[in-house]
């Protein structure tokens, strides 16, 4: 007798998502034809909003499409019809449904930049490409002309921040040059959509903290990969910090636009939201998501974010500095230069060397071998200001001074890049 096999969790997930897809398409279209203001789509979305596997299968079914030679997801007709139904729906008759839809897109986005591995075995080989397509469609839709900031509930803001946080390469590209990858542009996404979406949730502290966390992790990974190269030098570190500064300035400018348009310019709410999010970006950029405690890190899946983060939990976990984020980022770059051994130990260019003068400060620490091992995330606001003064006044060796000045100029240039992108190249729809 042949033994019956039990369905696996993955098969059950696919079955649930497919049922939601078929029922949602069928009954949803019938209800609209009958003029009904209620259908099963809301129920289907609500049922899978906290299930990333089912959410991804609903928005980009694995069996309905393929990955092309460039790694881009090419959807089938069922997927196209699904998105046509979702994006043409009269959501004003289903306002709670937008909360559910954004929860589903946020959950699905947690498969961005993930691949099958021993530590992540349930991820399919197509998951990243499918999630990129779903994120592109979602960001294009909610950042497009069909919505305004007034349409966004606080729940929508937090959910959509997860989508953007899990699309950090697109945010970073929009901050410096505006050229997005094929995986999202094939779904209709433009850099202006990203700017508009961030602008629309830019007044929500939890949403901005969530975005800053995802973006910080992206820059942390890039910096770590770059500087682990044996041939890496101060130019590579400077380029990395220029990109961090551009992302930071881009977020700051878009959030400040939102507060200004709401007649809250320079308010305490603006200062708290902006400074907190940028300080989180700095801290996670330096240490990565591993710096979060179990409570705050419970929202992550691998190196992505599965649910909106709570700002207070993140800042409590990081012990985020209350100082000026811009000064803090510059100080981090100087300290990183010390940690990576980019300063001279025998320069004959005169003056006091960086490594010698740094030892006089309370932020300086060494490992057991006597090498600099400074915790860049632990710098207080006063210590960051002290590090800036150290660069300016105490390091007089011309070789070391040149490295510090180049890092300083890189961050200044990145700050300009991000601001220019938000104000001109990729200016948001300020509606």
Regions found by a protein language model. Name each.
Residues 26-430:
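Non-catalytic all-alpha helical scaffold/repeat segments
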């Amino acid at each position: 007798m042949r033994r019956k096999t039990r369905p696996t969790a993955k098969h059950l997930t696919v079955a649930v998502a497919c049922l939601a897809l078929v029922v949602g398409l069928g009954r949803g279209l019938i209800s609209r034809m009958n003029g009904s203001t209620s259908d099963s789509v809301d129920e289907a979305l609500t049922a899978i909003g906290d299930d990333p596997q089912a959410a991804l299968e609903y928005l980009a079914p694995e069996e309905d499409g393929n990955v092309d030679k460039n790694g881009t997801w090419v959807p089938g007709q069922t997927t196209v019809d699904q998105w046509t139904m979702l994006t043409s729906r009269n959501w004003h008759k289903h306002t709670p449904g937008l909360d559910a839809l954004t929860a589903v897109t946020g959950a699905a986005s947690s498969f961005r930049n993930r691949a099958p591995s021993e530590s992540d075995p349930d991820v399919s080989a197509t998951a990243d490409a499918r999630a990129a397509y779903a994120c592109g469609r979602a960001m294009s839709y909610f950042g497009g002309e069909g919505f305004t900031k007034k349409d966004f509930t606080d729940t929508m803001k937090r959910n959509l921040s997860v989508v953007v946080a899990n699309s950090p390469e697109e945010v970073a590209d929009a901050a410096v040059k505006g050229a997005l990858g094929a995986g999202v542009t094939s779904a209709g996404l433009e850099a202006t959509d990203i700017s508009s979406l961030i602008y629309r949730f830019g007044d929500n502290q939890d949403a901005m903290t969530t975005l800053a966390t995802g973006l910080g992790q992206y820059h942390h990974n890039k910096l770590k990969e770059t500087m682990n190269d044996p041939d890496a030098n101060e130019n590579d570190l400077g380029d990395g910090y220029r990109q961090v500064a551009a992302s930071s300035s881009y977020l700051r400018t878009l959030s400040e636009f939102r507060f200004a348009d709401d007649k809250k310019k320079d308010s305490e709410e603006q200062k708290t939201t902006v400074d907190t999010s940028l300080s989180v970006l700095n801290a996670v950029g330096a240490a990565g998501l591993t710096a979060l405690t179990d409570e705050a890190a419970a929202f992550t899946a691998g190196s992505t974010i599965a649910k909106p983060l709570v700002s207070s939990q993140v800042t409590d976990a990081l012990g985020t500095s209350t100082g000026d984020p811009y000064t803090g980022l510059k100080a981090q770059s100087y300290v990183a230069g010390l940690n990576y051994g980019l300063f001279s130990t025998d320069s004959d260019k005169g003056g006091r060397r960086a490594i010698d003068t740094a030892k006089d400060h309370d932020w300086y620490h060494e490992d057991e071998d006597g090498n600099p091992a400074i915790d860049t995330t632990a710098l207080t606001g006063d210590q960051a200001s002290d590090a800036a003064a150290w660069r300016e006044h105490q390091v007089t060796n011309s070789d070391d001074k040149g490295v510090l000045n180049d890092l300083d100029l890189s961050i200044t240039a990145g700050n300009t890049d991000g601001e220019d992108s938000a104000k001109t190249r990729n200016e948001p729809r300020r509606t």
